[in-house]
Curated annotation (Swiss-Prot):
Catalytic activity: dUMP + (6R)-5,10-methylene-5,6,7,8-tetrahydrofolate = 7,8-dihydrofolate + dTMP
Subcellular location(s) of the protein: Cytoplasm
EC numbers, comma separated: 2.1.1.45
Taxonomic source organism: Nitrosococcus oceani (strain ATCC 19707 / BCRC 17464 / JCM 30415 / NCIMB 11848 / C-107)
Name of the encoding gene: thyA
Protein name: Thymidylate synthase
Length: 264
């Protein structure tokens, strides 16, 4: 995961200091891209330990189209609690937009199901796009989508994915996002009888929060270890029926976790 460490170094070397919505302040750059060949291993950073269960459960929650933290809590995950209301609701965030994008006639579009059908039937289409950032719904969301749009690309029997992340918390968020969309690419590839290709991460406002500068510098002192691999133990009837126990990360070795505060 050297591209990730190179991004941290780039922000420390060239980033500009800016105020932000949370009041924490950031060092940021605008526009950056990283590429990961999924055939070479699963892109989990190894320079600090990640909470793999939280990453995988969150993606399965998105795929279910849910917006209440109950499913997360039922599986021991609390990463969305800071934004949920007293009933556990978060508004029309990722899962809602992926599975129930509102239409002008009052109906809904299941973007994920439609994209899956397109990949199967028209793999070379340039329209394999799913959008989470719905401007008409932003004010109703507890947190507007940071990872805003993603696109799939099929070539030579391999499925690749590119994510555009409008706002990128490099220390806490980006490692989760890379792993989450890499997993999504693997799942869709399995459902469509394809191999995996690349995951391409593209960021807009790419930043380190002020209180993450020292933890980020600590990561830079650690030499990356070999990447683990993903094992999918079952192929369910649909993309929306995977369970956590269907997934296994093999040979994940990492340095210890590095604690850092989240900015809400």
């Amino acid at each position: 995961m050297k591209p990730y460490l190179e991004l941290i170094q780039k922000i420390l070397d060239t980033g500009v200091e800016r105020d932000d919505r949370t009041g924490t302040g950031t060092w940021s750059i605008f526009g950056h891209q990283m590429r990961f060949d999924l055939r070479q291993g699963f892109p989990l950073i190894t320079t600090k330990k990640l909470h793999i269960r939280a990453i995988f459960i969150e993606l399965l929650w998105f795929l279910r189209g849910e917006t209440n933290v109950k499913y997360l809590h039922d599986h021991g995950v609390t990463i969305w609690d800071e934004w949920a209301d007293e009933q556990g609701e978060l508004g029309p965030i990722y899962g809602y937009q992926w599975r129930s994008w509102p239409l002008p006639d009052g109906g809904y579009l299941d973007q994920m199901a439609k994209t899956l059908t397109q990949i199967r039937n028209h793999p070379h289409s340039r329209r394999h796009v799913v959008v989470a950032y719905n401007p008409a719904c932003v004010d109703e969301m507890a947190l507007p989508p940071c990872h805003a749009l993603f696109q799939f690309y099929v070539a030579q029997g391999r499925l690749s994915c590119q994510l555009y992340q409008r706002s990128a918390d490099v220390f806490l968020g980006v490692p989760f996002n890379i792993a989450s969309y890499a997993l999504l690419t693997h799942l869709i590839a399995q459902q469509c009888d394809l191999d995996v290709g690349e995951f391409v991460w593209t960021g807009g406002d790419v930043h380190l929060y002020r209180n993450h500068l020292e933890p980020a510098r600590l990561q830079l002192t650690r030499e990356p270890l070999s990447l683990p691999h993903l094992r999918i133990k079952r192929r369910p009837p649909s993309l929306f029926e995977y369970q956590y126990d269907d997934l296994e990360i093999v040979d994940y070795q990492s340095y210890p976790a590095i604690k850092a505060a989240i900015s809400v």
